[in-house]
């Protein structure tokens, strides 16, 4: 509460963060693996750790969910549908630009931590410039030295692993698509997700768990659709 004794309010971004972290919590709380080293998130491959957390974020964009959990502080009215529709439109604004930017970061990371050997005509900056020439929509000015401060892949733990951000989005979107097909609040599908993804933790390969849940290999279609990047067929 603030100095006027008004309750603290959550923005929509706050709710997304809450659902995201709750997804990690569910991964731990709903494990059935007794070995601590493989229970919950433990021993799950780096590029699948974010599957449950990013999966939960999808519920923050569902009308049936937001309608029942939102209230105006003064009128107690739920979120108006027209405002929700505007939120969806804003969510997908320039989604393609953000998509290719993440691809730029991931490809650069792989190049640097793969076969890269510095030498004449082969600097870190030149590697980044080459990647940008292939995928970037807007090329930064020549003085830009983003690579010098790309802490995720140098000072952080994402060396040769930055791609995991986007791959986890593929997995989580495709997993959520199963709920869209069955009903986003389907108890049966929730039980299946628990049994095949959350309960097993790191006791088996994440891709094997995904196949067990979805019945097939991961597909990118749901991620593109969720980002408004699929063409409407007349």
Each language-model region and where it sits:
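Cation-handling catalytic/transport regions enriched in His/Asp/Glu
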Residues: 1-234
């Amino acid at each position: 509460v603030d100095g006027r004794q008004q309750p603290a309010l959550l923005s929509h971004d706050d709710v997304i963060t809450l659902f995201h972290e709750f997804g990690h919590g569910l991964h731990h709380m709903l494990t059935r693996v007794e070995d601590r080293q493989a229970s919950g998130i433990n021993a799950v491959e780096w590029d699948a750790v974010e599957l449950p957390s990013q999966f939960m974020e999808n519920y923050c964009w569902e009308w049936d969910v937001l309608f029942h959990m939102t209230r105006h502080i003064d009128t107690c009215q739920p979120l108006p549908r027209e405002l929700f529709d505007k939120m969806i439109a804003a969510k997908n604004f320039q989604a393609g630009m953000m998509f290719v930017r993440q691809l730029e970061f991931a490809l650069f990371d792989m190049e640097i931590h793969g076969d890269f050997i510095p030498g004449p005509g082969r600097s870190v900056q030149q590697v980044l410039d080459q990647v940008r020439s292939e995928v970037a929509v807007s090329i930064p000015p020549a003085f830009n030295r983003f690579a010098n401060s790309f802490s995720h892949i140098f000072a952080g733990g994402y060396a040769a692993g930055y791609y995991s951000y986007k791959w986890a989005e593929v997995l989580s979107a495709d997993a959520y698509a199963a709920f869209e097909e069955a009903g986003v609040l389907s108890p049966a599908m929730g039980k299946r997700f628990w049994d095949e993804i959350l309960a097993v933790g790191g006791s088996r390969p994440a891709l094997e768990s995904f196949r067990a849940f979805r019945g097939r290999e991961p597909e990118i279609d749901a991620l593109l659709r969720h980002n408004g990047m699929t063409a409407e067929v007349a």
